[in-house]
Amino acid sequence: MKRRNADCSKLRRPLKRNRITEGIYGSTFLYLKFLVVWALVLLADFVLEFRFEYLWPFWLFIRSVYDSFRYQGLAFSVFFVCVAFTSDIICLLFIPVQWLFFAASTYVWVQYVWHTERGVCLPTVSLWILFVYIEAAIRFKDLKHFHVDLCRPFAAHCIGYPVVTLGFGFKSYVSYKMRLRKQKEVQKENEFYMQLLQQALPPEQQLIQRQEREAEEAAAAAAAAASKSIHDVDSPAVAQNGSAGGKKPSSNTLPELEYREKERGKNESKKQHNHNQNHHSSTSSSILPSVDNKAQEMEYMENHVNSKRLSSSDLLGSTENLLKDEHSSSSSSSTSSNSNKNYKNASGGGGGGGSSSPRGHGTANGSVPSSSGPSSSASSSSKGDRKQKYGGGKNSASHRDPVENCIPNNQLSKPEALVRLEQDVKKLKADLQASRQTEQDLRSQLGSLGTSERSIRSELGQLRQENELLQNKLHNAVQAKQKDKQTLGQLEKRLKAEQEARAAAEKLLAEEKKRKKLEEATAARAVALAAATRGECTESLRRRISELEAECKKLTLDIKVKEDQIRELELKVQELHKYKENEKDTEVLMSALSAMQDKTQHLENSLSAETRIKLDLFSALGDAKRQLEIAQGQILQKDQEIKDLKQKIAEVMAVMPSVVYSADTGSMTPVTPHYSSKFMDTSPSGLDPNASVYQPLKK
């Protein structure tokens, strides 16, 4: 295979098309397509008697439900369906039918044109006016040709579904605005804390950061300009969907240009950094007092921010001593562990101001619980260390921190005072880190206190519920006690009455016993007197007495037997009474049953009579209908004959002349024909024109 090299100079460039004519042709074709679709849908509506444009919002609703189920879950999709269904029901019930159909059709076509690529322009507005005019002038009044009951739910959905989407859109817009407001507030706080941190840095590092930032901005601007120019050169001129291309420049840059611009920015920043280091070595003697002033300003700003941010430190006054101890221990342990990290952040570019998050800034500037405690001690210790380093130059080399051994090569040319100031800044940062740790501890303690408070509140609620239950039980017990007291009073009254009755019965029994004793005494006296008088008859009397006693025993036994028989008879009598009562009830029921049977028989007889009467009436009605049909047929025949006669009369009148003149031309008197209206009888008729059936007059 031979390789064929193409001649690049002979390549043909694509022909440039006129964008204006292309846009006009595309737009006209688009609007013609709209008109054709609209006409076809209206034709289908008229032919099939159904409004097919109402199916488009239903299809949009199904798509939105599917998307919500796919991306937001089943719960949100069910909630969305319920809200849309409720809105549809409200529109279906409270909007009149004609206005509902008008609003639904108008919304569908306006929304269909609104979803195009053109937006609001003169052709779309003209189409909207056309659609609204057709709907209001023609289709608003003509609802007879459509299935109203079938189309009405879809029309209600065409109004209810956009209302629901508008509500969700308004909610998302409000949430978006609130989120932007919150972002702006957080951005302002972050800028404030970044400004504080940048002002706390030495001025030479501020200058270095400012120059690096300007270099990065210049490099980014150059890269954006280059990418924009390349995009303008290589942008396609072919329009899609009737719109001219190349109007929206893309912000994507080429990777080669990005790499070159980044390398150029890095080289410029390195050159400026070396120049600033040389300039710093010559002007370090004049910067030292300004650095001291900046350190004092940084301490003042930190104290001000601590006093501003920690207004809640009064709530933790009882634990202040404990927090001071924790702060001192954590500061002593964290200075050695975080010194290397803080040193790297300080030497890398701005003292860690660019790498820390906004939340980190917030905790760093508002973490000390008492604004006059650890922060003031840290500032005083840093000042004392600074004085010792400035005053004692002999012992400074032997008592240096281990961090000084990690000084990079680009800072060897700096004076020792500046290095010591940087170490002081590192110590301050370590103190800030310790204060952050203490703040985290305090927050954890606050969280634990909050959880304990919640648990105590829940326990308090449970105790309140138990107290309410106990109060209810106590109330019920008091009510039961009162009822028991009332029943006890009633029982005591009954007991007193029974005791009184018992005392009366005992009195009667004692009186009867006394009477019996008196009778027995009198009988004994009489017997003694008789025995005394009749001593001879004692034996016979004794026999008689024994016989009488035997008879008395027999009589008592007979009395007991009779009493048992009487009891049995009483039981039988009671049973007979019950049986008689039952018989009376059965007699009443039988009488009621017989009365009901008589009533039912009477009702059946009356019902049969009514059915006979109804049958007679129906037969009479059928006869009357048949006679009426016969009479109507005769009337129709007569009407047909009258029409034929009228037609014949019209033909005769059309053939014969209307006026007949005599032979005398001088007089020329018109002769009235015999078929003229003058010969008609104008006397009023006695017939009723509104009568359904002809009735002859009675003479």
Swiss-Prot record:
GO biological process, one term: chemotaxis
Superkingdom: Eukaryota
GO molecular-function terms, A-Z: microtubule binding
Any one cellular-component term (Gene Ontology): rough endoplasmic reticulum membrane
Subcellular location: Nucleus membrane; Cell projection, Axon; Rough endoplasmic reticulum membrane
Primary location group: nucleus
Sugar attachment sites: 241, 267, 345, 365, 690
Keyword terms of this UniProt record: Cell projection, Endoplasmic reticulum, Glycoprotein, Membrane, Nucleus, Transmembrane, Transmembrane helix
Low complexity bias (residue ranges): 329-346, 366-382
Transmembrane parts of this sequence: 28-48, 75-95, 120-140, 154-174
Segments for region (Disordered): 219-289, 322-411, 432-451, 679-699
Membrane topology per record: Multi-pass membrane protein
Biased composition (Basic and acidic residues): 257-271
Similarity remark: Belongs to the macoilin family.
Biological role: May play a role in the regulation of neuronal activity.
Annotated protein name in UniProt: Macoilin-2
Organism: Danio rerio
Species lineage: Eukaryota, Metazoa, Chordata, Craniata, Vertebrata
